[in-house]
Amino acid sequence: MKHIILAILFFIMVSGLSACTTSQPIQNVEKQVITSTASDEEVRQAITDAATSLGWVIVADHGNEITAVIDVRTHQATVSIPYSSSNYSIIYKNSIDLNHSGGKIHRNYNRWVANLDQEIRRNLNIAKTHH
């Protein structure tokens, strides 16, 4: 009986520790379809407006690809955002102090990318209504 109780306690302890983990698989945004009729320039503007409004800094903007960096306290993430008039992607490029290892990263990175994606889509919908 004592062994069963110890085994149950061990299982609960291990389960509790795994629930506290902050690492998740990296969630890239791959070929997000743009449903509005937008030019490459309008898509670029929607991306840069979204990024800067959320604290991302555009560090490169060449040939339908934007590189953006976000710094939050000691953490930094860099993404590549290739785009066209029909789709865009947000791809992990590099990070500092986000526990990147084996395709996993701190969950805040995925939240930052999801927020960026949502804001880009919102900006594209606003641009669509102004046509």
Protein language model features and the residues they cover:
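Positively charged n-region of N-terminal signal peptides that target proteins for export
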Residues: M1-I4
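Sec-dependent N-terminal signal peptides
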Residues: L6-M13
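C-terminal motif of bacterial Sec signal peptides marking the signal peptidase cleavage site
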Residues: S15-A19
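Ser/Thr-rich, low-complexity intrinsically disordered terminal regions
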Residues: T21-H131
